């Protein structure tokens, strides 16, 4: 057990130096981290992850990264910030989420909030209207799933 966040960060910096100097073993390269959520849990996990050599990529790049030569990713980790459209297709079958598509049928108060909350409201009100795609499009390409939801 690590006694403090400061000590954990020191350990991660040591690991970062080793990855930079020696690379990752080819058997585990590329090492791809997928982060869900946009709150404090996900933010804290990303804060620690970002102490390591890394590159963030969009989810649309995951399949090509998985098939790329291991040497391309030997000295850094890959991070992907997962969005609602990476989890499910919208009711229209589109992976592009729009505000107009996600008005809640529930009598909820009008809030001034980011569009993601409108999407979540609609999803929780009508989950069967959405088609799951995460298990097919994203999960097979991840080494580590960090659940920040």
Predicted regions and their residues:
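Conserved N-terminal Rossmann-fold NAD(P)-binding element of oxidoreductases
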Residues: 33-37
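Dinucleotide-binding/catalytic capping subdomain of oxidoreductase cores
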Residues: 2-32, 43-144, 148
